[in-house]
Amino acid sequence: MGFSTADGGGGPGARDLESLDACIQRTLSALYPPFEATAATVLWQLFSVAERCHGGDGLHCLTSFLLPAKRALQHLQQEACARYRGLVFLHPGWPLCAHEKVVVQLASLHGVRLQPGDFYLQVTSAGKQSARLVLKCLSRLGRGTEEVTVPEAMYGCVFTGAFLEWVNRERRHVPLQTCLLTSGLAVHRAPWSDVTDPVFVPSPGAILQSYSSCTGPERLPSSPSEAPVPTQATAGPHFQGSASCPDTLTSPCRRGHTGSDQLRHLPYPERAELGSPRTLSGSSDRDFEKVSPSEQGPRMPPENCGGSGERPDPMDQEDRPKALTFHTDLGIPSSRRRPPGDPTCVQPRRWFRESYMEALRNPMPLGSSEEALGDLACSSLTGASRDLGTGAVASGTQEETSGPRGDPQQTPSLEKERHTPSRTGPGAAGRTLPRRSRSWERAPRSSRGAQAAACHTSHHSAGSRPGGHLGGQAVGTPNCVPVEGPGCTKEEDVLASSACVSTDGGSLHCHNPSGPSDVPARQPHPEQEGWPPGTGDFPSQVPKQVLDVSQELLQSGVVTLPGTRDRHGRAVVQVRTRSLLWTREHSSCAELTRLLLYFHSIPRKEVRDLGLVVLVDARRSPAAPAVSQALSGLQNNTSPIIHSILLLVDKESAFRPDKDAIIQCEVVSSLKAVHKFVDSCQLTADLDGSFPYSHGDWICFRQRLEHFAANCEEAIIFLQNSFCSLNTHRTPRTAQEVAELIDQHETMMKLVLEDPLLVSLRLEGGTVLARLRREELGTEDSRDTLEAATSLYDRVDEEVHRLVLTSNNRLQQLEHLRELASLLEGNDQQSCQKGLQLAKENPQRTEEMVQDFRRGLSAVVSQAECREGELARWTRSSELCETVSSWMGPLDPEACPSSPVAECLRSCHQEATSVAAEAFPGAGVAVLKPHALGKPWASQQDLWLQYPQTRLRLEEALSEAAPDPSLPPLAQSPPKHERAQEAMRRHQKPPSFPSTDSGGGAWEPAQPLSGLPGRALLCGQDGETLRPGLCALWDPLSLLRGLPGAGATTAHLEDSSACSSEPTQTLASRPRKHPQKKMIKKTQSFEIPQPDSGPRDSCQPDHTSVFSKGLEVTSTVATEKKLPLWQHARSPPVTQSRSLSSPSGLHPAEEDGRQQVGSSRLRHIMAEMIATEREYIRCLGYVIDNYFPEMERMDLPQGLRGKHHVIFGNLEKLHDFHQQHFLRELERCQHCPLAVGRSFLRHEEQFGMYVIYSKNKPQSDALLSSHGNAFFKDKQRELGDKMDLASYLLRPVQRVAKYALLLQDLLKEASCGLAQGQELGELRAAEVVVCFQLRHGNDLLAMDAIRGCDVNLKEQGQLRCRDEFIVCCGRKKYLRHVFLFEDLILFSKTQKVEGSHDVYLYKQSFKTAEIGMTENVGDSGLRFEIWFRRRRKSQDTYILQASSAEVKSAWTDVIGRILWRQALKSRELRIQEMASMGIGNQPFMDVKPRDRTPDCAVISDRAPKCAVMSDRVPDSIVKGTESQMRGSTAVSSSDHAAPFKRPHSTISDSSTSSSSSQSSSILGSLGLLVSSSPAHPGLWSPAHSPWSSDIRACVEEDEPEPELETGTQAAVCEGAPAVLLSRTRQA
């Protein structure tokens, strides 16, 4: 994370960073003392929050997150510690931390795997300048985390057992019971009870008293009254590193309360719990579980917990808990032992960071390690417990409170003097008050004296800062005690059955008309800070009856709902602040909140939806803090619980609300101002109104009405359940069962109709309703509720009537059913009697039927016995096949033939030979009958078919690994060998030669011609070598003889072995560094038709073989079809020849092993490719299924209408291609990873769709950013997806890049020797195809950016490459962006456009048919030359200087291939034209050497008008001295499509000087491609200009270039101008 300062130097900017660092340290040290122990954890969590949510801006993180979080955490700490006033905490950071263990986290624990029952607390951002407390736990589905927002009103009861019970009751899932605590790299699991029970420090008197009683057995106080002065109590099992007294310590009595009073309040610990002394030694049964990455790093050392190690914070001196350190040695033997936090015990490596800046410079990972659960050792606890006896207590005590921290010995008067109204510093009392009540924080000055007298202590009086007060009274504790300890009590937040509501802004939700509200929102947490708070922080049970609220608060009449309405029809709630009730300690925010929620549920739904108007009468008495907190919680929610608040104050009051206040209220200073909102007739007598209202009558009416309504609801539920029980019945089968059902039915109806509640309602309900109508209060609310009760009573009558009717119908059905069952039973009896009578009359027929049944049963039994025998044989065969398949394991060709391998092979061979040979025919017959026992044995057939192959491999591997005379080799065991061959012939498919058809299989192994001498390999169509496979057991010559044209083929094969002079390699596997002219072999050549194609090849024009004595040339480019990109990278066009030569001894076993078995790394790469392919298809289908229908919606924005193809491109076609074709290809290559390259090459054309997609992607992004993101965001929220549509649309581009990486990994592994040359070549070519797709989309976008071009670029062939060059023309230099097409080379000038992509201004272009090239110019290796026709002047020559040698090599290679392809194409067209004109086509040519150039040969095709090398060849070409002379050939070409003759392309090897270019001539008519560099695997396309500023400076300004004739206007001359392709030229 970086900080931005105004000064970039090291002065003020460095000071700003230091001040920011100091401010962050002060804030964190005030929240998490001792900071030396917690710095490692909290600094790293703050660092992660700043990086993830604030873009690394530390200042923004401080103001937007840390300071609001500090206010929320201080409020939480005050509320939690309020009930322990007068006690000194052993861990001063409780409940936020316990020494080094952090309880309330600042960041999400991303790296921790939550288990069911685990949870942790975290403070998060909740909008602008506010924070909230959330509880995070495992979601219901177990796939992520869900969060529960903790309402601010519940902060006082968070660290109690009742809070967790409430959360578990709302979740209705696995109960939460374990809290996660963090300490550096470790995550500890602690029971919630251990976290909620703090540890206290004993006073010296208590320590002496406990020490004096140490000699005897421990004595528990018999009653709370026996407990001594409130000193210290250890309240349960403790955290590691905590200290406690091992002796019996007493618990404090609560000051000013009896025991019965205490036990009423749920958030407080029971008196028995506080009174029972607990020591650390007795708490080992509930120690923490710890999640610690102990395997990956050293455990965090315990930090110094002594008081001397704590650094007081000068800025927050008053907010910091005071340290109590006892150094008196009381004589306890354990006091002289070294405490666990001794600095000498700290390990050398420091895992924490002393400052925020250090954490930035040296970050430490948190939570990313593997979890390991283990119990925390008890020894650390006992060691920590010894320290308390010595008095060496941890440094800080107790919590942040609403008042300032002072010396415990200071008197209240001193406190009063210190905190005057003029003090507004950061340490003032009001700084820790809740953020929610800022708008009511200014107090009237006239009431401060009375408030100070009303408070027990003066340090809560007004004026600490302009905030924290409602109508003049401090929002803090109204019931304070003298500052004897560091704490001050807050009002007791009573958590009843469904306690509190949320005070978090925007999180209150109520939708149930009857009153109950939603449970707290638990949505899957998106794991990022600042997620907007969810809605619905209510407890599940809103009070529904008057008995469910605090009776004392209700009976007091300080909060009433008279039933009046304001001028807009909203219900009015009146609150009086003139009551002693508000000064009592138990007047809590929770009780008032529940009462207001009850009031809100009383009006009808239309009025309830408008919200309440709360009128607070704060005249002559300020409002209590409970009122402000309750109203803030109810107002800041999405559901309109409270619509507005009217605050009636005295006229002399100076109170005004803040503009930035979260609580919005209207301050009125007179009743006349109140009448603007509420009419006087709608106000009670308390507010000088005329509305008649009696609070006692209202309570009585509500009690009677609610009791009656509750009885009606209970009766309705009872009747509905009875009705359901009538409809859920079993179907009886006999008359007896029907009779039992009738009895049960009658009994149930009797019980229902005689129910006491139902009887009383039916008898007395009308009377009760009449009495309620007579006592009706005359308000809208009473009328509405009475009407609702009447409808409930009417519904009871309806339910009774419906039940009686249903019961009567059911009873009639049962009666009919009983009659029918009786009739059926009688019929069955008669049928049985009739059958017995017939059997007696005809016994002979009965005996025959019995005999037939016995015979059939015997046949079934015999068939079952036969099947049992067959199953037994199948079982034995299956075991045999499994044994055979287990032999495959040791036969790994990668394993070296060491002694263990040889021993394993021998044991497998012995096991194989132990199987009787006669067992195989029967097993084979059984295996090969799949219909015998059905489909389940198909796998056994596969295993059986592997047996001969495995047996053969076993013997071969055994003979190679360890030749032993005792083991018979393959040649000495003819029976087994013959059996293997016979099995393979019977059960394997015959060998098939590979075809280049794109629809072929994923891998088709070719067959070696093992019958030939030296095992020559047959070459396929594209120069592919047919690889030897498993079918090497056949005789290939016998197979060839059975094919069409077999005789000629075998003759040629036999002849080739004698004339071959070098071993055969695939062209892709040849060393690429050698010039391709060395592939032209001087050998006797011949032509072989393809065996599987018959006479088809004889008439194909694209395989024309030319034979000459000593020279072999093949041309395959007679058609207009362009070669695929991978063929350009693999080999030049001249390499597609059909030739045979013999390899140099390749062992079949080695070849077979290399092809069948790959390394585990290759299999892993292939598995990753298949798995990611499936995921990629799933993502594309996800977009199609969910986002495509959005474009058909009626509310589609106008900017998106008709833009479906612009946004999504050809995404659907990509999905169909990958799902229907490419995934199947990859799955077929799963066991043969090296064949995956062929799959890519087979679908090269389909991969071109990615170019179209990439070209469309910028338009899609622009449309989404302007219109689509907001529109599709709703669908994303509906799906609950973390990724937006733009992320999914980026997946195709990422997928192509992933293909390139995976292919590179495959190439790296295959180059270790597992792959043959052809497989490596295919993988390299596949990589070229994929990289081309990545680059070509950008190239097409750049092509669209060409401006001012008068040439149709779409007709110039494929764009091959583009780049920036320094172009030299004469003495001028220009920086040009050059585009190279198949038929055109274009020069343009780059023009920068601010805020957009670059555009290219067209300058000039030339047809590639009219240019020649000199490959090297000068000695730099970066320059090459392009020239035109006969170069009459120097301006006809362009020298291009590349930015690197790789770019130059790639361009010269591509241009060379283009020139040669055009020359060969022209030659083929010329030959065909001459043949059609009757001139004839002579396949053979005469090669005549010249006397002057022995190294050159002139090849003439005897065609008329063909120029032959003559004396026109200049001496500078023939006898060059500056460069070595090489053999030259020439190609004659003409363009018959144009009205002019196409110039001849003359390709020479070198020219010695620039002047030699003017004297070039035609060398001949036949040219052979002799490339100087290998095919470049990929062409570099610059995203930015590779030229530095100094190079650009030396390039002259753009001037008008000389007009050059383009290739479309070629001169007509008899000699036909020539174009040279030369090797080198000295600059």
Curated annotation (Swiss-Prot):
Subjects to autoinhibition, mediated by the N-terminal domain. Residues 211-349, 381-475, 501-537, 959-1008, 1049-1111, 1124-1159, 1519-1558 are annotated as: Disordered. Residues 1161-1340 form the DH domain. Residues 1352-1460 form the PH domain. Residues 241-251, 1057-1068, 1101-1111, 1133-1144, 1521-1535 have a biased composition (Polar residues). Found in a complex with ARHGEF11 and ARHGEF12; binding to ARHGEF11 and ARHGEF12 enhances CDC42 GEF activity of PLEKHG4B, and PLEKHG4B, in turn, inhibits ARHGEF11- and ARHGEF12-mediated RHOA activation. Interacts with ANXA2; this interaction is required for PLEKHG4B localization to cell-cell adhesions. This is Pleckstrin homology domain-containing family G member 4B. Residues 1070-1081 have a biased composition (Basic residues). Its main location: membrane. One of its GO terms (molecular function) is guanyl-nucleotide exchange factor activity. GO terms for biological process: axon guidance; cell-cell adhesion; regulation of small GTPase mediated signal transduction. One of its GO terms (cellular component) is nucleus. Residues 1545-1558 have a biased composition (Low complexity). Keywords: Cell junction, Cell membrane, Cytoplasm, Guanine-nucleotide releasing factor, Membrane, Nucleus. CDD domains: PH_puratrophin-1, RhoGEF. Residues 262-273, 310-322, 975-985 have a biased composition (Basic and acidic residues). It is found in: Basal cell membrane; Cell junction; Nucleus; Cytoplasm.
